[in-house]
């Protein structure tokens, strides 16, 4: 639940910082979450501290979370009015007719689709870290538009977060691609035969 809610806060932070962003999906994954989005500015790893700062500001509000179930038609209209084309696509392609789960941060205009359970308020989010940026095709299809993706993780306490980040750092050091470069094991020839 912590990862789900933190992904929603990331989406809200992106909306605050970049009002023209179009949100796609923000599922949880093992030990974290990601959020895909379309934005005319390329987000880099250097942008993550600013985004984290905005997320902390949102979390500090302690806003309560409200989950509402609405019909397919109402859900499509809601996201059309917000110009959220990816959300509309998800809704329109769904065979589901009713009970679309929507997530609201009270005292804000932010709303998103969300299927998972939620903590009751933002004050329950623990320490988090945005970890990397990447690209991803909409619906995993290279014929579709390339979106941007931000990965993150959230933990119950600072010690658990620190342990996880240390584990990631150690795994990165052992990555065969990095080791190959460091040990000069791979060579590319520029000579064409």
Model-predicted segments: where are they?
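Active/ligand-binding-proximal structured segments within catalytic/core domains
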Residues: 1-17
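Auxiliary tRNA-acceptor-end handling modules of aminoacyl-tRNA synthetases
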Residues: 13, 22-28, 34-191
């Amino acid at each position: 639940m912590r990862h789900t809610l933190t992904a929603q806060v990331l989406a809200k932070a992106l909306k605050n910082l970049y009002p023209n962003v179009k949100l796609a999906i923000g599922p949880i994954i093992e030990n974290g979450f990601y959020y895909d989005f379309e934005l005319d500015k390329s987000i880099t790893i250097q942008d993550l501290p600013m985004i984290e700062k905005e997320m902390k500001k949102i979390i500090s509000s302690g806003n309560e979370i409200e989950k509402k179930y609405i019909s397919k038609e109402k859900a499509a209209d809601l996201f059309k009015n917000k110009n959220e084309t990816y959300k509309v696509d998800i809704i329109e392609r769904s065979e589901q007719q009713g009970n679309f789960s929507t997530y609201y941060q009270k005292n804000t205009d932010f709303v998103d689709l969300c299927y998972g359970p939620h903590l009751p308020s933002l004050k329950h989010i623990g320490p988090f870290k945005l970890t990397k940026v990447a690209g991803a095709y909409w619906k995993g299809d290279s014929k579709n538009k390339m979106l941007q993706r931000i990965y993150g993780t959230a933990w119950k306490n600072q010690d658990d977060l620190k342990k996880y980040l240390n584990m990631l750092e150690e795994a990165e050091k052992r990555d065969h691609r990095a080791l190959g470069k460091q040990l000069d094991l791979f060579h590319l020839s520029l000579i064409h035969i």
